[in-house]
Structures are given as C-alpha cells and as structure tokens.
C-alpha cells in the first residue's frame, strides 16, 4: 500500500492504467456502436417513438408516453416498475443509429457503482489512499465486461441491460 501513498507516482500509474483499460475496452465500445434494436425494444418504446417522430424531442410528452408505457406494462404484463419507464426512453427513439449508445448507457453507471464500492472498501482500510479506488474500479469494470457470458444481451441490448445490469449499478 506504500505505493499508493506517493501521490505523484500513483497519479502517473493511474493515468497509464486508465489509458490501458480504455484501450482494452475500446473494441467493445466500437462493437456497441453497431447495435440495433430487436425484440422487446420495439414494444417498450412504441409510444415514445411515436411521440419522437411526431414532435421531436418534446421532453414532457416523451415522459408522459414513458409513464403511460410503464402503467400499461405494470397492469397488463409483468409488473415492471422503473425498468419499463427506462426501456420506453431507450436511445433508439430518434433513429437506429442512436441505439449504439446503449453500451455507454450501461457501462458508465456500472463504472460509477464499482468506483463507489471500491472507494468504500479502500477508505475503510486506509483513508489516506484515494487513487486506489478508481484503479480498482477500472480493473473490475474490465473483468466484468470481458467475463460476461453473453455481452450481446448484457451490454448491447437495452432490454437485457436495463433489466439486469443497470440495477446492479
């Protein structure tokens, strides 16, 4: 742990680690840009997509349509709570090319969660060490993304990602 107390040296290594991890995650992000909606994506976002086509980015109408979708699926299907609302606001509302943002929509909250968890553990062990938490979070994120059994459903398909990954975060 002495290494992490030397702030200048640990900042340099943290910068290198972040750059290395970003380079390792870059192929997964590039693949994510080619993701397209499928299956349940169309049903959950039908009402909000209709609003987006008719009115553009009209936030009050989009939120109202997302709320109506949530109420509909809650009453008629499986009792979705928050995920029905989030699924109705998926990135592909304004066109399929925006659906590729799903990867980032999942990975950013996941990284924030892992950073928070690592920060709690590191501060409990040694409150003076501040730069170890982001390093651990990057390592855990890399392991999480690379070790996922089915990345197509967990990172690139909004329905699978929101219902399972986002709540982990």
Identify the function of each model-found stretch.
Residues 69-104:
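Short hydrophobic/aromatic helix or loop-helix immediately within or flanking a transmembrane segment
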Residues 13-17, 74, 127-138:
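Membrane-interfacial loop-to-transmembrane alpha-helix junctions, especially the N-terminal start
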Residues 132-133, 140-169:
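Membrane-interface micro-motifs in multi-pass membrane enzymes
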Residues 1-27:
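Start-transfer (signal-anchor) and selected internal transmembrane alpha helices
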Residues 31-53, 58-63, 74-86:
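Extracytoplasmic catalytic/substrate-binding loops of multi-pass membrane glycan-assembly enzymes
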